[in-house]
A protein has these predicted regions:
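Short, conserved phosphate/pyrophosphate- and ester-handling motifs at nucleotide-, phospho-/glycolipid
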Residues: 3
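Amphipathic, charge-rich alpha-helical segments that serve as recognition/docking helices
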Residues: 8-87, 92
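Amphipathic alpha-helical extensions and coiled-coil-like segments
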Residues: 49, 53-61, 79-179
Length: 179
């Protein structure tokens, strides 16, 4: 399962044999064991989503089984699967490059993608351009979700107007205007 770095190092040392330990595990169990034994940086939400999708598709694991094996909730599994199953590749790439936070993609873009891929792409571009934080992205998503088709279109065509209005509403009124 994991050993390509060790093999490359042994080749550089001129070794043509490798000592190995074979554990009697299924491929799925070996993949999960390999993940649990890693000491490197934690995987990104997308990488976890790809792994979950692989385990679901190739090995037939259901959401509950994946949640149990990862010691997480079904909702956690479902959100990460949504990243790779629902979001278009271009948006996954924006998440991969750090232009869009994975949490923003999971919480807001995945639900939009289920309703409209075009709106999802436009919203993703807005989030990427603004480097939107979760709170700001949530405000736009909530307005989009509550709006009619015409309101949704205006939100995505002129997001700056929406964000300007949000900033104005969040600022306290000047003291002289209070009664």
């Amino acid at each position: 399962i994991d050993g390509y770095k060790r093999i490359a190092a042994l080749e550089q040392l001129g070794r043509d044999t490798v000592d190995a330990v074979v554990w009697p595990l299924s491929e799925a169990a070996a993949i999960l064991l390999d993940r649990s034994l890693r000491f490197s940086e934690p995987e990104t939400a997308l990488e976890v989503g790809w792994l979950l999708a692989e385990l679901q598709q190739r090995f037939g694991y259901g959401l509950e089984e994946l949640a149990r094996r990862f010691d997480r909730s079904v909702s956690w599994v479902w959100r990460r699967l949504a990243l790779v199953e629902v979001l278009p590749e271009a948006i996954q790439e924006q998440v991969r490059q750090g232009q869009i936070a994975a949490q923003v993609a999971m919480k807001f873009l995945a639900p939009v993608a289920r309703q409209s891929l075009e709106d999802c792409r436009r919203m993703a571009d807005i989030f990427a351009q603004r480097r939107a934080e979760v709170r700001e992205a949530g405000q736009l998503y909530a307005a989009w979700r509550q709006g009619s088709r015409a309101v949704r279109k205006r939100l995505l065509e002129a997001p700056e107007l929406f964000f300007k209005t949000q900033r104005q509403q969040s600022q306290p009124a000047p003291a002289g205007l209070l009664r």
